């Protein structure tokens, strides 16, 4: 009987250790943000002109090394010509526009993804009647400890 009790204790201890070894996300291991909570009316960035709505998701998260934004460019607005300091990805969700990449102008439509590399230059202009809505993603120059 003593051997059975010892075996049972060992089994229970082993199960407890296994449970500790299984990786579980820490409480609060995710953050959810909605458009309405982060939306800000802003002029076209980089002196692009016109009006836009900027959505800076997770901008208050400490030490996050990633920037994730959405921007709605109103008719006639744009993102001005600027040199890229880090790789940056643009993805068009809706609307139409023209993007100038190192002096070459291309049309962008829903489903277009553009990677702009460090040292390149680009600008973006909304065309058509509907807002040009884009996602923008890049590595933060330095993770903020906001």
Which positions does each model-derived feature cover?
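Glycine- and acidic-residue-biased ligand/ion/polar-headgroup-sensing regions
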Residues: 85-88, 92-97, 102
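A short, N-terminal "cap"/entry segment at the start of jelly-roll beta-barrel domains
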Residues: 17-65, 145-146
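Ligand-binding loop in jelly-roll beta-barrel domains
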Residues: 62, 118-144
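Positively charged n-region of N-terminal signal peptides that target proteins for export
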Residues: 1-5
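Conserved short histidine dyad/triad with adjacent acidic residue
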Residues: 67-84
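Short acidic-glycine-tyrosine-enriched beta hairpin
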Residues: 104-119
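Bacterial N-terminal signal peptides
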Residues: 7-16
């Amino acid at each position: 009987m003593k051997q059975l009790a010892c075996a049972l204790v060992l089994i229970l201890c082993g199960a407890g250790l296994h449970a500790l070894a299984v990786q579980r996300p820490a409480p609060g291991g995710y953050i959810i943000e909605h458009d309405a909570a982060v939306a800000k009316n802003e002029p076209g960035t980089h002196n692009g002109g016109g009006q836009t709505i900027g959505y800076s998701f997770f901008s208050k998260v400490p030490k996050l090394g990633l920037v994730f934004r959405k921007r709605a460019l109103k008719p006639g607005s744009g993102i001005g010509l600027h040199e890229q300091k880090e790789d940056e990805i643009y993805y068009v969700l809706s609307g139409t526009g023209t993007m100038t990449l190192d002096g070459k102008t291309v049309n962008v439509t829903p489903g277009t993804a553009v990677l702009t590399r460090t040292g390149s230059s680009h600008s973006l202009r909304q065309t058509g009647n509907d807002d040009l809505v884009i996602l923008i993603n890049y590595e933060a120059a330095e993770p903020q400890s906001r």
